[in-house]
Regions:
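Glycine-rich, anion-gripping cofactor-binding loops and their flanking helix/strand elements
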Residues: 82, 217-300, 402-430, 444-448, ...
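Conformationally flexible catalytic loops at phosphate/diphosphate-handling active centers
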Residues: 148-151, 155-210
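Thiamine diphosphate
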Residues: 100, 107-118, 399-553
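A short, small-residue-rich loop immediately preceding and capping a beta-strand
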Residues: 21-24, 45-47, 65-104, 271-279, ...
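Active-site diphosphate/adenylate-binding microenvironment
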Residues: 8-11, 29-30, 34-39, 347-431
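Glycine-rich, acidic loop regions that bind phosphate or pyrophosphate groups
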Residues: 101-152, 242-349, 453, 475-476
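Phosphate/pyrophosphate-binding active-site segments
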Residues: 1-2, 291-390, 511-553
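N-terminal cofactor/phosphate-binding cores enriched in small/glycine residues
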Residues: 2-89
């Protein structure tokens, strides 16, 4: 029988799946559930050592014998600090040492309770990874606990071996052993990708044996996308490839991702069974939710070195490497792979959604302003780079842009969007025009980007001003708060006209569709620069325009 502590059982189950066979265990009551489980596992041999400092080096010596990871487990408090010398030695010798410490619950740290100190990250920087496990109370916390253990156990094998620290808070009662078997935990397998990586080629071959194949491309630089265009086209012949304009350097309509997801509802025919996620963040919350609901037999995430992202909560395999390398490897494995009915199903849905999109003419709103902006760019054959602000602005760009979008999506903050566009425009002022589409809060928050002696003439700004944070009008339930507009959405009556006068920026404005059309003509044909077009809209009308748009699908 095993302990009834769920985080302890998740940890134990994954140690077994990782084929850990040796554990040095030290005495204590708080770590007794862990020690009990280790001793109860027939796959793990336990070696009791009383002195923690010695125990750490005993475990280190075991790793030298066969170069396999070894556990050393201690109780809470200063017992953990006694492992610091062994952790440091293991770090510099590159030894795979798994340090497991029991801990008191977080609420009892620094409360003059017995055997307590700040244990999280206590051994850094001399361990490769430090994690503190939650005590799970729901499925999301169970997933989080599983992910953290996987993260640590994968890190222990990095770079020929490294020590890691897994800290395990355990609440009382401690001594209940009534669980008959360990849970069947998800074990995430990690590979390192190079262009001659045989294991990654084998994984790609396994992937293409699936029936419902999907690639999701998160934010990628235009250089990476450009270098991978042929490979991406090869993938599209056999798999569904989802890419927002943050990962699409092709000139053409934006993929109607949210629109299709609205159309298909809960139809599982559209769910992939083999999924690979490459690149950075995706904008669409609807897409993230959709993919989290999919039950994939194989779910691969491509991460950078020392990254461990499990965005869709069902990762089975991870590849650490460059996106273009992995895209190229998988594209090379498409030879002889037949196009699946799954691809045809999605292609028809995309075509239908694009046809509907063409028929929609929004009311005067931010949506119309962005649509008209991109239509005018096409009419005038404008060649330039696009920068978008976050929140509502980039979501509209992902509907109407037909070219690559730059956006600060790493953290998704509203600060710095304008400054980033200014920086790019300065660096490229002799080569190309730069257009920044931005919401009012993001613009006014970052207006000092224009207080700049180097402000270049090749910068044009489309400012969407609806008197506050428009996205807060789109969040269901927030309308019930009487403080939404004044305190949450930062309602205001500010205009950019005075700012433009101060910084010698050509100022244009529009308050209706006719003014918008005329001002866009001036924006794209102005011989002076920089130039700013401020479009004034109503937040409620903006919200309704968005609702009307999605109701059409």
């Amino acid at each position: 029988m095993y302990s009834n502590k769920e985080n302890v059982n998740i940890l134990t189950a994954l140690l077994v799946k990782e084929k850990i066979t040796k554990a040095v265990v030290c005495p204590g009551s708080r770590n007794s559930p862990i020690v009990h489980n280790l001793c109860a596992c027939p796959e793990i041999e336990c070696y009791p050592v009383t002195d923690e400092r010695s125990a750490g080096f005993v475990a280190l010596g075991m790793t030298l014998a066969d170069n396999e990871p070894v556990v050393v487990c201690v109780t809470s408090g200063s017992a953990l600090l006694n492992l610091a010398p062994a952790a440091a030695e293991a770090f510099y010798q590159k030894r795979p040492l798994i340090i497991i410490s029991a801990d008191r619950p977080a609420q009892w740290i620094d409360q003059q309770d017995g055997q307590t100190l700040q244990q999280h990250r206590a051994l850094e920087p001399n361990v490769r990874k430090s994690v503190t496990l939650p005590e799970p109370h729901n499925e999301e916390e169970r997933w989080y606990c599983n992910r953290l253990v996987n993260e640590a156990l994968n890190a222990v094998r990095l770079n020929d071996g490294s020590p890691v620290h897994i800290n395990v808070p355990i609440s009382e009662p401690l001594f209940e052993y009534d669980v008959p078997k360990l849970p069947d935990e998800r074990n995430i397998f990690m590979l390192h990708a190079t262009t001659d990586s045989i294991c990654v080629y084998e994984m790609a071959a396994d992937f293409f044996r699936g029936k419902k194949l999907m690639f999701v491309l998160g934010q990628l630089t235009p250089e990476v996308v450009g270098n991978s265009l042929e490979a991406i086209e090869a993938l599209k012949k056999v798999a569904v490839v989802i890419q927002e304009k943050l990962a699409d350097d092709d000139i053409g309509p934006a993929q109607p991702i949210d629109e299709v997801l609205k159309m298909i509802g809960e139809d599982e025919a559209y769910h992939p069974d083999h999924l690979i996620y490459i690149g950075g963040t995706i904008v669409s919350k609807r897409l993230r939710q959709f993919l989290r609901e999919c039950k994939c037999k194989m779910s691969i995430v491509v991460n950078g070195i020392d990254e461990f992202c499990d965005t869709f909560m069902h990762t089975t395999d991870m590849i650490q490497g460059l996106p273009e390398d992995v895209i190229g490897i998988f594209a090379n494995e498409t030879e002889g792979v037949k196009k699946r009915d799954f691809v045809t199903l999605w292609d028809k849905a995309f075509d239908k959604a694009l046809a509907i999109r063409k028929t929609i003419r929004p009311r005067f709103s931010q949506m119309l302003a962005v649509k008209a902006f991109h239509e005018k760019m096409r009419e005038e054959a404008v060649d330039g780079e696009l920068f978008y602000g976050n929140s509502s602005a980039v979501r509209l760009g992902n509907i109407f842009s037909d070219q690559y979008i730059y956006v600060n999506r790493g953290v998704n903050g509203i600060e710095g969007s304008l400054s980033t566009a200014v920086g790019y425009a300065i660096a490229h002022q002799e080569e190309e025009d730069v257009y920044c589409v931005i919401g009012d809060l993001s613009f006014f928050y970052d207006q000092n980007a224009l207080w700049n002696e180097s402000l270049p003439p090749n910068l044009s700004i489309l400012l969407l001003n609806n008197g506050g944070g428009g996205i807060f009008h789109q969040l269901p339930g927030l309308e019930r708060s009487p403080y939404r507009d004044s305190a949450i959405a930062a309602q205001h009556t500010t205009s950019a006209e005075g700012i433009c006068q101060t910084h010698d920026i050509v100022y244009l404005s529009a308050r209706n569709e006719e003014e918008l059309d005329k001002s866009l003509d001036k924006l794209f044909n102005s011989e002076e620069g920089p130039v700013l077009l401020e479009v004034f809209t109503n937040a409620e009308e903006d919200t309704q325009a968005l609702k009307d748009y999605y109701q059409a699908f």
